[in-house]
């Protein structure tokens, strides 16, 4: 069974498990309340008092690496006379008066209802490493209640998990927790003396102060809590100063708790030797050094961050398509610092809507009034809405006002795309092409592509977010390109669901002065490439990425492509030339940090041509990769389609569109805040299916028009596109 089917089965089993306990246990009056505008389903519980536990809540995720997420609201029920929590993710905040910022073994006892509990993971806030410890527990059949006793190694309990929690239990198939006990060993070593560290962060080339990501670790790997001189960061409704850097950040230390500072930083720490790490995105080299902190002295360090590449000098400016934060005021230096510290020039901050609610609100001012800029780095408002598992998640850039559909028209995506298209500079597309999970033909990508299949033939889809979370998924994008639709690629981190801003990014070539208007205008022309490390250069007969080259049949096409990759991030593997979706040439990097490819093609017909580069890291869920937008070669006004593939692709996409009017809804088990939207989406799908018929008919007519035009280009496609010189 595939991983996606296993996961869906597990989630359905969880629902069944919770239904079973609900049928046999008594619901008690233990009111749960949500925490503000919280997209994680955080619900605090009025549970029985547990020693040294200040708060208990259910949530969608714990933010302790390795602890599973969930989508079922927690309940408190009586089981055999005991008050128990039924749920998937349960967070526990240890009373700070009992334990806070310690470093010692802690004994944890968890009592659960055996018959209703599936395998679960205990996660905790830990010193060193990723900042999280995990232990897996597999219940064995036995008594009505079982107590699992575990040792939480190097427990820190400094409130780094969701809503300041210290410990979380995650069980995708459900768990029934009936009591919990935390007992300290009191082995934390109290420092005998302290000193101070003062950091100055500069760009080595300009000498100016810059924000950066930082790590400071003692000889045990412990990261002292960041001081109030660091940036206050936002993760959902959490305000915190430290985060855990995942493996996709290429962070060079085995210790991955990091913080951010804007030019200067100062803190008080125990005396000793520390590892100091600093970074500023993929165009900069890592700084690594050791510093000594002595008693009652200040250790001053100036970090001159060295560039590996200077993309703005060549007119290329990076952006992140997909950042979620709540912004109350347009001017937000803390948030700006978070984005600028990763050297992202354009951070698109997206309000996020669903059929019931809107999260991550942006200021009332939109359009140009929503832009905040400092030192050539911008943050600007946009939106991710509408969002459904049936049609996909959509992103809209550079908009003059938000366009959130009402519940009774939420599946009428075309209304948003048409409204944004009518706004000066508005750009619309689809997110998350890298998602995996349940959906059409066992792959949610099929469902996510349904919205694109409906709107692309109407000329409403400007881009697809093909790179996210270490995955570049190009199948749907290539299909649209092979129909002649000039859809651009984008890359977005989806912070705080996935990566820090800028871990994946897309570069835009700007001719002339850089500002947001010129950046969005150049992106709209397709002058872009997506990457999480490799940097690309690509021309055909002097035309660059995203440009159109009109030639006569038989014209020689001189392809010149190059890629480079900072070896501190990964080892460059190869560069590929892609013609109409097929790899036409490959050049190995042969152990070097840069590679060039030269190829001669013959323009026998129109085509789209792109390049992509790979690093050595090629895990399916974590690949080092870059991909350019195409250069479009036009011969005799023929569309840049893959002529022989057009009928098959049209039949596939046309079928998906036509089934919209008859298929039942397939609401994903996770995503889209399913705990608050599932029933509404199911009801509204039935009501709104008939309303989609005009759009379905328009898309069908557009596909037929494409086939009619295709028939006029009757000459067979050549077997090859050229030869290597």
PLM segments and residue spans:
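Extracellular carbohydrate recognition and processing domains
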Residues: 129-161
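Glycan-recognition and processing domains
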Residues: 33-100
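Exposed low-complexity, polar/acidic, P/S/T/G-rich flexible segments that act as propeptides
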Residues: 172-190, 630-633
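C-terminal functional module detector
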Residues: 202-267, 273, 277-310, 483-725
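Short beta-strand-plus-loop segments that form exposed binding edges in beta-rich domains
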Residues: 166-175, 614-618
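Catalytic cores of extracellular degradative/oxidative enzymes
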Residues: 260, 287, 311-489, 493, ...
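Beta-strand-rich domain onsets/edges
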Residues: 183-196, 202-207
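Solvent-exposed strand-to-loop "edge" motifs in beta-rich extracellular domains
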Residues: 111-117, 564
């Amino acid at each position: 069974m595939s991983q996606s089917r296993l996961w869906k089965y597990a989630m359905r089993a969880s629902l069944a498990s919770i239904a079973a306990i609900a049928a046999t246990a008594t619901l008690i009056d233990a009111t749960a309340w949500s925490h503000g505008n919280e997209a994680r389903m955080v619900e605090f519980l009025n549970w029985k008092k547990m020693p040294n536990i200040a708060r208990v809540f259910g949530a969608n995720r714990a933010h302790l690496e390795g602890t599973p997420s969930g989508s079922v609201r927690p309940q408190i029920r009586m089981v055999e006379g005991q008050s128990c929590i039924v749920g998937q993710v349960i967070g526990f905040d240890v009373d700070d008066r009992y334990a806070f910022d310690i470093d010692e073994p802690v004994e944890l006892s968890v009592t659960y209802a055996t018959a209703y509990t599936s395998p679960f993971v205990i996660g905790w806030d830990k010193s060193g490493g990723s900042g999280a410890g995990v232990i897996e527990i597999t219940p064995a059949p036995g008594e009505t209640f079982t107590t699992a006793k575990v040792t939480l190694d190097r427990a820190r309990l400094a409130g780094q998990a969701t809503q300041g929690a210290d410990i979380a239990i995650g069980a995708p198939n459900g768990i029934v927790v009936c009591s919990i006990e935390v007992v300290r060993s009191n082995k934390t070593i109290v420092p005998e003396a302290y000193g101070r560290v003062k950091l100055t962060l500069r760009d080595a080339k300009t000498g100016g102060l810059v924000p950066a990501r930082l790590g400071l670790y003692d000889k045990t790997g412990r990261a002292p809590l960041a001081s109030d001189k660091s940036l206050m960061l936002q993760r959902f409704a959490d305000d915190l100063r430290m985060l855990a850097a995942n493996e996709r950040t290429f962070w060079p230390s085995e210790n991955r708790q990091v913080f951010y500072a804007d030019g200067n930083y100062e803190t008080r720490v125990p005396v000793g030797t520390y590892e100091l790490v600093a970074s500023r995105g993929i165009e900069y080299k890592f700084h690594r050094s050791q510093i000594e902190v002595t008693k009652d002295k200040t250790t001053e360090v100036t970090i001159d961050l060295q560039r590996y590449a200077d993309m703005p000098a060549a007119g290329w400016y990076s952006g992140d398509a997909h950042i979620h934060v709540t912004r109350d005021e347009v001017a937000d230096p803390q948030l700006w610092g978070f984005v600028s510290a990763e050297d992202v020039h354009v951070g698109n901050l997206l309000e996020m809507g669903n059929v019931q609610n809107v999260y991550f609100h942006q200021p009332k001012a939109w359009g140009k009034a929503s832009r905040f800029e400092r030192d050539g780095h911008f943050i600007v408002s946009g939106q991710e809405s509408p969002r459904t598992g049936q049609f996909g998640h959509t992103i809209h850039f550079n908009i003059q006002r938000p366009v959130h559909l009402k519940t009774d028209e939420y599946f009428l995506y075309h209304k948003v795309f048409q409204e944004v298209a009518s706004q000066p500079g508005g750009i619309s597309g689809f997110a998350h092409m890298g998602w995996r999970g349940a959906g059409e033909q066992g792959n949610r990508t099929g469902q996510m592509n349904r919205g694109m299949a409906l709107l692309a033939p109407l000329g409403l889809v400007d881009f697809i977010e093909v790179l996210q979370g270490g995955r570049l998924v190009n199948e749907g994008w290539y299909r649209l390109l092979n129909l002649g639709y000039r859809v651009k690629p984008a890359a977005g981190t989806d912070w705080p669901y996935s990566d820090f801003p800028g871990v994946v990014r897309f570069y835009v070539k700007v001719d002339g002065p850089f500002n947001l208007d010129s950046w969005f205008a150049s992106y709209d022309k397709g002058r872009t490439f997506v990457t999480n490390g490799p940097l690309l250069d690509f021309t055909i007969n002097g035309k660059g990425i995203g440009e159109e080259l009109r030639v006569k049949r038989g014209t020689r096409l001189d392809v010149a492509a190059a890629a480079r990759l900072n070896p501190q991030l990964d080892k460059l593997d190869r560069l590929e030339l892609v013609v109409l979706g097929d790899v036409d040439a490959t050049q190995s990097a042969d152990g070097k940090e840069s590679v060039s490819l030269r190829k001669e093609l013959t323009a026998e017909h129109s085509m789209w041509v792109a390049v992509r580069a790979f690093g050595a890291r090629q895990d399916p869920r974590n690949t080092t990769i870059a991909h350019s937008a195409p250069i479009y070669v036009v011969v005799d006004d023929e569309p840049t389609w893959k002529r022989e593939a057009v009928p098959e692709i049209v039949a596939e996409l046309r079928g998906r569109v036509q089934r919209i009017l008859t298929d039942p809804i397939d609401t994903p088990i996770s995503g889209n805040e399913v705990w608050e939207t599932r029933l509404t989406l199911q009801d509204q799908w039935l009501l709104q299916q008939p309303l989609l018929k005009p759009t379905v008919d328009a898309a069908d007519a557009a596909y037929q028009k494409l086939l009619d035009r295709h028939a006029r280009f009757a000459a067979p496609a050549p077997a090859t596109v050229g030869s290597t010189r």
